[in-house]
Structure formats: structure tokens, C-alpha cells
Regions:
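Residue-level detection of the helix-turn-helix DNA-binding "recognition helix"
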Residues: 16, 31, 42, 46
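Short, cationic-aromatic polyanion-contact patches
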Residues: 1-8, 22, 54-79, 109-115, ...
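Short acidic, hydrophobic short linear motifs in intrinsically disordered regions
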Residues: 17-30, 59-65, 70, 86-104
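Basic amphipathic alpha-helical segments that dock to polyanions
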Residues: 26, 41-49, 90, 112
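Exposed, interaction-prone assembly regions rather than primary DNA-binding/catalytic cores
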Residues: 85-168
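Pre-recognition alpha-helix immediately N-terminal to the DNA-recognition helix
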Residues: 6-13, 85
Length: 168
């Protein structure tokens, strides 16, 4: 029992040190089969000590430590053209309005679970889906969504700031 806990701690340290890893890499490091390494990684994922990606490399998911999400971008080379287009569009714009996207992009965004976070926004009794780039802060996303909805335009914000400064 103690040996299994020691082994899990070693696996956690490997994931922490190497970033997103495949079960085969962990297996080689600790000298066990891919199947056993996968089982230990699954247990660590269930206990929320390690995260699992939706991105697959050769059919295997990547395992990573909380805070290493940005490192998942290294594994997007295997994306097909549609996935790459949606990935690039979202990474450049930070927030996308679902209803403004081409149907193929809308479908792909739903599959890019590691990078595209859905936000259900209620506005004027309507509910809309927006997609947030996974590294975008909630505050930044809120500003961008408000701009897209016409709640606050960048010019209005500048004018508000000018008025505040003029009153000082």
C-alpha cells in the first residue's frame, strides 16, 4: 500500500516537472507498462491531483498538472484544417459569438474543449453562446462580450474616462 502511494507521488512529480505527458512517457520513467501507468494516471485524475486533456496524441490523452494548461498548445500540430482555423480564430479574438460563426466553426468549437470555454449569456431575454479562449480572464471576456452586444462601446468607455478626468 505504501509503495503504491510512493509510486503515485513519483508520477505526480513527473507530471509536474515535464508538463503534459502521455502514459507511455510516465511508464518509461517509472519502469511499468503503459496500462499500469494509465491506471495510476486515471486514479490521480479521479482524485483531482492531475488533469486530463481532450487533446489526443496518437489516441492517448495528455495528463497535466493544474497551471500547465498553456502548455497544451504544443500539441495542436495534429489538428486538421478546420480545427486549426477555429483554434486560430478564437486565440486571436479571445471571445467569439457563436451565432456569428460559420456552421463548421461552431461545430469545431464544441470539440475544442481544452481551448474553447462556452459561456451562456442572457441579454434582453435572449440567451446566447459565446466562446472564451481558455487563457482569457473572465473580466476581459466580459468586456469583449459587452462590446459585441453593444452594451459598452470602446469609444463610450474612453469618453467616460475623459469626463472623470475632466471633473478632477
Amino acid at each position: 500500500m505504501e509503495k503504491a502511494l510512493e509510486l503515485r507521488e513519483k508520477i505526480v512529480e513527473i507530471v509536474k516537472a515535464k508538463g503534459p505527458v502521455l502514459p507511455v512517457q510516465v511508464g518509461k520513467e517509472v519502469g511499468m507498462s503503459i496500462l499500469m501507468a494509465s491506471a495510476h494516471l486515471a486514479e490521480l485524475t479521479a482524485s483531482k491531483r492531475v488533469k486530463i486533456s481532450n487533446v489526443k496524441v496518437g489516441g492517448s490523452p495528455l495528463y497535466y498538472f493544474p497551471g500547465q494548461e498553456a502548455m497544451l498548445q504544443k500539441f495542436t500540430a495534429s489538428f486538421n484544417d478546420k480545427e486549426k482555423k477555429a483554434f486560430d480564430l478564437l486565440s486571436q479574438n479571445k471571445v467569439l459569438r457563436d451565432s456569428e460563426q460559420e456552421p463548421v466553426i461552431r461545430v469545431v468549437l464544441r470539440d475544442l474543449k481544452d481551448f474553447a470555454l462556452p459561456l451562456n449569456v442572457k441579454y434582453n431575454n435572449n440567451q446566447e453562446i459565446f466562446w472564451k479562449w481558455y487563457l482569457t480572464t473572465d473580466q476581459e471576456a466580459e468586456k469583449l462580450i459587452k462590446t459585441k452586444l453593444g452594451i459598452e462601446r470602446p469609444e463610450e468607455k474612453i469618453k467616460k474616462e475623459e469626463k472623470i478626468l475632466a471633473n478632477d
